[in-house]
Amino acid sequence: MAAQIPIVATTSTPGIVRNSKKRPASPSHNGSSGGGYGASKKKKASASSFAQGISMEAMSENKMVPSEFSTGPVEKAAKPLPFKDPNFVHSGHGGAVAGKKNRTWKNLKQILASERALPWQLNDPNYFSIDAPPSFKPAKKYSDVSGLLANYTDPQSKLRFSTIEEFSYIRRLPSDVVTGYLALRKATSIVP
């Protein structure tokens, strides 16, 4: 194994191994620096180069091992995946083409025109023929005078109001006007 260790090339100064992380002016690169410090560095450097040579050899052996023992290309059996349809054909939409295509929204006139062009029957359901169940949310109550959201109801006339000014206005109304407001809301008049 000693015969296979690669020879590490040195730079112009013999016996000094340069570490690429250190600057050239550092004392470890200087052969004439203090006493045994430089010699011990040289020994450590040569030991590390020896270890590098072994690791390089091991790496080269590891690279060659799979090629020697390989029995050729290994083909896996083409097993169909249960979630993929083998008869699926792409429609051409999607992928890189989909990002480039400009998608525009249809306006209301275009939607209505396309719905009119469809062959509707008289008994087909539409938004007006569907009987929806009553909502679970409580119905919003609006003022009979101003149309704003009304949190209050006058107990005498049963008209709804939202502010104090509306309440004072409702109290001064004659009974026929109160009946007219209630008729607009389709509420029965309780006031005789």
Curated annotation (Swiss-Prot):
Localization annotation: Nucleus
Region Disordered: start-end pairs: 1-44
Keyword Glycoprotein carried by entry: no
The organism's place on the tree of life at top rank: Eukaryota
GO annotation, biological process: chromatin remodeling; DNA recombination; DNA repair; positive regulation of DNA repair; positive regulation of DNA-templated transcription; positive regulation of telomere maintenance in response to DNA damage; regulation of cell cycle; regulation of chromosome organization
Cellular component per GO, a single term: nucleoplasm
Pfam families: YL1_C (PF08265)
Signal peptide: none
Keyword annotations of the record: DNA damage, DNA recombination, DNA repair, Nucleus, Transcription, Transcription regulation
PANTHER family attached to this UniProt entry: INO80 COMPLEX SUBUNIT C
Function: Proposed core component of the chromatin remodeling INO80 complex which is involved in transcriptional regulation, DNA replication and probably DNA repair.
Assembly description: Component of the chromatin remodeling INO80 complex; specifically part of a complex module associated with the helicase ATP-binding and the helicase C-terminal domain of INO80. Component of some MLL1/MLL complex, at least composed of the core components KMT2A/MLL1, ASH2L, HCFC1/HCF1, WDR5 and RBBP5, as well as the facultative components BACC1, CHD8, E2F6, HSP70, INO80C, KANSL1, LAS1L, MAX, MCRS1, MGA, MYST1/MOF, PELP1, PHF20, PRP31, RING2, RUVB1/TIP49A, RUVB2/TIP49B, SENP3, TAF1, TAF4, TAF6, TAF7, TAF9 and TEX10.
The protein's name in its UniProt record: INO80 complex subunit C
Organism: Homo sapiens (Human)
Source lineage: Eukaryota, Metazoa, Chordata, Craniata, Vertebrata
